[in-house]
């Protein structure tokens, strides 16, 4: 088969025009084109047919050294990347090239990054809880298999540690794999995450096949084309794990979904499209929908997505986060105020919520205990001004009891993490859902009113708190 070869006629920033004259056949929209700058391969993606046998492309890599007249080869298909278990423990870029310096990824399975969402008949409509082993999440903002979770958190509140614990726990409890897509990541943060995963055993360098995670990075310094597509590359690997013969529960992290939108906006502007509200691309809802609709459960397995979301200027009505919210099933909010108390994970129990915290799905007991816990914490929050100004002595006996229970609940919402054992010295705890519900039920009913507050801090189950209380006496 003869290769379809064109030549670069124009380069403007990350946009490249390529003219095909040999046989009059133009590459299809979204096809990957290849050109070489010395020995470096540069991948271009066809975005528009602009007439005169010319296609307009978006570059997936730096354009340094490319000039007009360079030959470009049509690959005949969209961007294709290696998928399957060979990607575990490895870092690749948007076009599937390894960037961890450990040689080629030897996978027999190669897949296009563009796929339709699963057919309606193949999708699973069951809503099953994905038990994470993290008490505060499982009780108050439970995740569903195949659900989409928004993770809101600033710098230094424990977002990375929470992500790694979720990776660790899902792998242990469900035998699942994880895919991490760094979209517009700081290179330093991506590097830190990789080394922390090695230290905590999530990535096994000696035996990569025993690793639990595959990483796909499109860093902040990459062209907008790479940042706009890297989430799709990560999702393609996650889909391959989900659709394996035995079926898998896969965890898919995107950090940061806002940067996916931002990169799409840059690409749109470079292609000369008229912007919509606040300068975003006119196809914002479509781009987001195409990504989010592929994140779903099928009869084989599930992809549960945790998406870090940056909110520009804390404006929740901004089109980028507002478009993301429409797809979310649960929100996990990390609070700096809670982190300052030394309570980790620093999940805000009142701001975090989940659509599946419903008695029809989680059961009457779980729902009732969760709402009682939130009620106690909300009452404590409303009493804090009085406590600050007048002190505890001015409260009624009933309010004093509520405050005491709330402080115990706050501390019991903390727990030691497996991935933090290295620097805390405390053994990590995976807490079953039944133990979580039983522990908090006892707390709100007053069964443990006689135990000291300190007994509930950084323990797993309520039995551990009772044992700890005996050592404190």
UniProtKB/Swiss-Prot annotation:
Q: Tell me the residue numbers annotated for binding ATP.
A: 153-160
The answer on whether this UniProt entry bears the keyword Transferase reads: no
Give me the segments passing through the membrane. none
Q: Where in the cell is it found?
A: Cell inner membrane
Which GO MF term does the entry hold, naming one? ATP binding
One GO cellular component assignment for this chain's record is: proton-transporting ATP synthase complex
PROSITE patterns assigned = ATPASE_ALPHA_BETA
* Bilayer topology: Peripheral membrane protein
Keywords noted in UniProt? ATP synthesis, ATP-binding, Cell inner membrane, Cell membrane, CF(1), Hydrogen ion transport, Ion transport, Membrane, Nucleotide-binding, Translocase, Transport
EC number(s) on record?
7.1.2.2
Q: Which family does the record claim for this protein?
A: Belongs to the ATPase alpha/beta chains family.
How would you summarize the oligomeric state and partners of this protein? Answer: F-type ATPases have 2 components, CF(1) - the catalytic core - and CF(0) - the membrane proton channel. CF(1) has five subunits: alpha(3), beta(3), gamma(1), delta(1), epsilon(1). CF(0) has three main subunits: a(1), b(2) and c(9-12). The alpha and beta chains form an alternating ring which encloses part of the gamma chain. CF(1) is attached to CF(0) by a central stalk formed by the gamma and epsilon chains, while a peripheral stalk is formed by the delta and b chains.
What HAMAP family has UniProt attached to this entry? ATP_synth_beta_bact
Q: What does this protein do?
A: Produces ATP from ADP in the presence of a proton gradient across the membrane. The catalytic sites are hosted primarily by the beta subunits.
Name of the protein: ATP synthase subunit beta
Q: Which organism is it from?
A: Rickettsia rickettsii (strain Sheila Smith)
């Amino acid at each position: 088969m003869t290769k379809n070869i064109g030549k670069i006629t124009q380069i403007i920033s990350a946009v490249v025009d390529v003219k095909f004259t040999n046989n009059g056949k133009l590459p299809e929209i979204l096809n990957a084109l290849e050109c070489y700058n010395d020995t470096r391969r540069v991948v271009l993606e066809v975005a528009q047919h602009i007439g005169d046998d010319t296609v307009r492309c978006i570059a997936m890599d730096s354009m340094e050294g490319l000039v007009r007249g360079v030959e470009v080869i049509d690959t005949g298909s969209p961007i294709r990347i290696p998928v399957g278990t060979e990607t575990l423990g490895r870092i690749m870029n948007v076009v599937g090239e390894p960037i961890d310096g450990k040689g080629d990824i030897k996978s027999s399975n190669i897949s296009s990054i563009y796929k339709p969402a699963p057919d309606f008949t193949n999708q699973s409509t069951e809503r099953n809880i994905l038990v994470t082993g993290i008490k505060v999440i499982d009780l108050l903002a439970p995740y569903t298999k195949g659900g989409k979770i928004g993770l809101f958190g600033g710098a230094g509140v424990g977002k990375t540690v929470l992500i790694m614990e979720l990776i660790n726990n899902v792998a242990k409890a469900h035998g699942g794999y994880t895919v991490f897509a760094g979209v517009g990541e700081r290179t330093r943060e991506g590097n830190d995450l990789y080394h922390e995963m090695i230290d905590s055993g999530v990535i096994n360098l000696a035996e990569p096949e025993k690793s639990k995670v595959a990483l796909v990075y499109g860093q902040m310094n990459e062209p907008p084309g790479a940042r706009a597509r890297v989430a799709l590359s990560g999702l393609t690997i996650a889909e391959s794990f989900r659709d394996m013969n035995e079926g898998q529960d896969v965890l898919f992290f995107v950090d940061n979904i806002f940067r996916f939108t931002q990169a799409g906006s840059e690409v749109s502007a470079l292609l000369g499209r008229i912007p919509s509200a606040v300068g975003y691309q006119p196809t914002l809802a479509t781009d987001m929908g195409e990504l989010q609709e592929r994140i779903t459960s099928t009869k084989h397995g599930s992809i549960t997505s945790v998406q870090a979301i940056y909110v520009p200027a804390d404006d929740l009505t901004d089109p980028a986060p507002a478009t993301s919210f429409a797809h979310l099933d649960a929100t996990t909010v990390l609070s700096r105020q809670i982190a300052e108390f030394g309570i980790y994970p620093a999940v805000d129990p009142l701001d975090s919520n989940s659509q599946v915290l419903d008695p029809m799905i989680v059961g009457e007991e779980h729902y009732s205990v969760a709402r009682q816990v939130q009620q106690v914490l909300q009452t404590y929050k409303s009493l804090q001004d009085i406590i600050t100004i007048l002190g505890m002595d001015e409260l009624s006996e009933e309010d004093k009891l509520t405050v005491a229970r709330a402080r115990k609940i706050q501390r019991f919402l903390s727990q030691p993490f497996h991935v933090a054992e290295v620097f805390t010295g405390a053994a990590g705890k995976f807490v079953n859902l039944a133990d979580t519900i039983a522990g908090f039920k006892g707390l709100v009913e007053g069964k443990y009113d006689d135990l000291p507050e300190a007994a509930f801090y950084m323990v797993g189950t309520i039995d551990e708190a009772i044992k700890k209380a005996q050592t404190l006496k």
